[in-house]
A protein has these predicted regions:
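Beta-lactam-recognizing serine transpeptidase/beta-lactamase-like catalytic domain environment
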Residues: 62-64, 224-238, 275-321, 326-561, ...
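Periplasmic/cell-envelope proteins involved in peptidoglycan metabolism and beta-lactam response
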Residues: 1-300, 390-400, 509-512, 528-531, ...
Length: 602
């Protein structure tokens, strides 16, 4: 009986102990499940910013591209202080930094706030440095160099050395060349990756921003291994990087640089506010060079914001006598004048309202061809009298004055032409020799091209094609070609302009073996108070051909300050001759060997 009682007590005690044990386990489990657990963070996201596309010249020089910029940082909680000197020594070896840079890191670390753990070791690392440092970080991680710590979220992690892509650097290898037309970019924060990327602000960078901009960033998401690398398996997310397009230009680097050099040399003498030169392939509208003396480094822009503007399309001005051929052509096309006709030029002096108009070549009479050859304002007034207001303004509209040329640049101005309903006789007279309207350099270049392109107006084009996803796409679909002048009228005007150089005001541009024609223009600059007596713009627009090639060339010299250089024959015309010589030297033109020079644009 006594034995039975002992067994029963033992069983009850055992049952009680087991119940107590289960209760302890239950309570402990509940506490463990409901409390914060310091579990190592095993997930990782990794981004790589897709890059903006490159810009490449006709002669296959990359003039603009992008690169990735990285920074190296460390969480100070991941490293023991007694190991930091060793770490810095390894960091210096792998990054290639100097002793001074190491000293700077130590100094900044001493000044680091106590509760600020994230420390940037080095910024502006290139891809090569970043690759070496990533290798170092991996080795140190595997060897247990870094210690684990509990972060603010209660998770245990070992951050160690992190190499982070933080910026896309836009590089302009050609420095100030091709500016201002190439434009520039500014940096904004990419919301997905948190990396600074570039967007176009001016020039080609702006116009083709959608094409040049990256399509898709690289993204890898998944579990990480002991070395901090993402484990690639069926559960990981991988998004491919798609960079922006590479833009191929019609512009030639060699030709552009040669013309820019010639412009700079001329402007040392002329002291002009700006010199602009454009060269267009007449039959295709391709711009082979578009140069300015007002250039800048896109990576180090100054405070003068006006330099950033592309004056070739954004500066509207009264062009003077270079407008005469278009009024002349309008009268010829409408049958208001005949080429064999002689017109009264009043001995080179003519009363227009309260003003007296004088010609440089004082003649009682001139043939129609001589009116252009000698740039007679009086002759043009007589021609304008035969046109009514609608005819003269419509004639300008045919050549696309008053509308954008369509060139692939942003912020193009369309200029101003007068309202025919409000055009008085005196205003119509001065319009005939280039006052009372505003035009741009590019409008004039495209309009003069008609005379050298069998009467066809064609859209000027800086870019030829772009490359993306393994294939080229031509941009020819954006080029408009329109017959606006009969072949006969275009041929007549071409010959008239050839005579300007061979027999008239453009003799300084004569080049042996080259068929060249064009027109000078000198115009006072209008200000709020009226026309100034000492500020002028000088222009020359024309063409230069050989047996197989035809180019339309424009020169604008804005406000030259050298005495008497405001005359186009003393400033713009010699610059035109420089360009023709460059085209020959660079083998764009080949002088004709025999003396039977005939036009090549039939």
């Amino acid at each position: 009986m006594q034995e039975y009682k002992k067994n029963r007590v033992s069983k009850v005690a055992f049952a009680y102990c087991m119940a107590l044990l289960f209760m302890i386990i239950f309570i402990s489990s509940t506490f463990f499940l409901t409390s914060k657990r310091h579990i190592p963070n095993t997930e990782k996201d990794q981004y790589a910013l897709a890059l903006r596309g490159s810009i490449i010249t006709k002669d296959n020089f990359t003039i603009t591209s992008s690169r990735q910029i990285y920074r190296a940082e460390i969480d100070l909680r991941s490293i023991n202080k007694d190991k930091f000197d060793l770490f810095l020594k390894l960091f210096q070896i792998y990054s290639g930094i100097s002793n001074d840079q190491v000293a700077d890191i130590k100094k900044r670390m001493q000044n680091q706030k106590k509760r600020s753990y994230n420390f940037v070791l080095l910024q502006n690392l290139d891809s090569k440095q970043a690759s070496y440092l990533k290798d170092l970080a991996k080795k140190l991680y595997i060897q247990g160099f870094f210690k684990a710590f509990t972060n603010n979220s209660g998770r245990v992690e070992t951050r160690g050395l992190n190499i982070i892509e933080h910026e896309e650097d836009r590089i302009y290898m050609s420095k100030d060349s091709f500016t201002p037309i190439i434009g520039y970019t500014k940096m904004i924060l990419d919301p997905e990756s948190g990396i600074l990327k570039n967007i176009g602000v001016k020039g080609l960078e702006k116009y083709y921003d959608e094409c040049l901009s990256p399509v898709q960033n690289e993204k890898i998401q998944g579990l990480k291994d002991i070395g901090g690398n993402i484990i690639l398996n069926l559960n990981s997310l991988q998004q491919k990087k798609i960079n922006g397009c590479d833009l191929y230009l019609n512009l030639s680097l060699k030709l552009q640089k040669s013309i820019e050099k010639a412009i700079d040399q001329r402007n040392e003498d002329l002291k002009a506010n700006e010199i602009i030169v454009g060269v267009m392939e007449s039959k295709t509208g391709r711009i082979l060079a578009l140069a300015s003396s007002r250039r800048y480094d896109p990576q180090n822009r100054g405070k003068d914001l006006s330099v950033l503007n592309a004056s070739a399309i954004e500066y509207g001005y009264e062009a003077g006598s270079v407008i005469k051929p278009f009024i002349f052509t309008t009268a010829l096309r409408l049958g208001k004048i005949k080429m064999d006709e002689v017109i009264n030029t009043y001995g080179g002096s003519y009363k227009l309202g309260r003003f007296t108009i004088k010609d440089d070549h004082k003649m009682d009479k001139m043939t129609m061809e001589e009116v252009i050859r000698y740039s007679s304002n009086i002759g043009m007034i007589q021609i304008a009298k035969r046109l009514n207001n609608i005819e003269i303004v419509s004639g300008l509209k045919i050549f696309k004055f008053g509308e954008k040329s369509g060139i692939d640049l942003p912020y193009e101005q369309k200029g101003e032409i007068p309202n025919p309903k409000r055009l008085r006789d005196i205003e119509k007279s001065v319009l005939s020799y280039g006052y009372g309207l505003k035009t741009t350099f590019m409008q004039l270049l495209a309009a003069y091209n008609v005379f050298n392109n069998d009467g066809f107006y064609i859209t000027p084009r800086l870019a030829e094609k772009f490359y993306q996803n393994g294939r080229f796409t031509n941009l020819d679909d954006d080029v408009k070609k329109e017959k606006i002048l009969s072949s006969e009228a275009a041929k007549t005007m071409q010959n008239v302009l050839i005579n300007v150089i061979e027999k008239g005001t453009g003799k300084k541009a004569i080049t042996q073996g080259i068929i060249a024609g064009g027109k000078t223009g000198t115009a006072r600059i209008a200000e709020r108070q009226g026309y100034t007596s000492n500020r002028y713009n000088a222009s020359f627009f024309g063409f230069a051909n050989d047996l197989n090639h035809a180019y339309t060339i424009g020169v604008l010299v804005r406000h030259p300050t050298k005495p008497y250089s405001y005359y186009a024959a003393q400033s713009a015309l010699p610059m035109f001759k420089d360009v023709v010589d460059i085209l020959i030297n660079e083998e764009f033109l080949t002088p004709i060997q025999d003396n039977n020079q005939t036009s090549t644009n039939n």
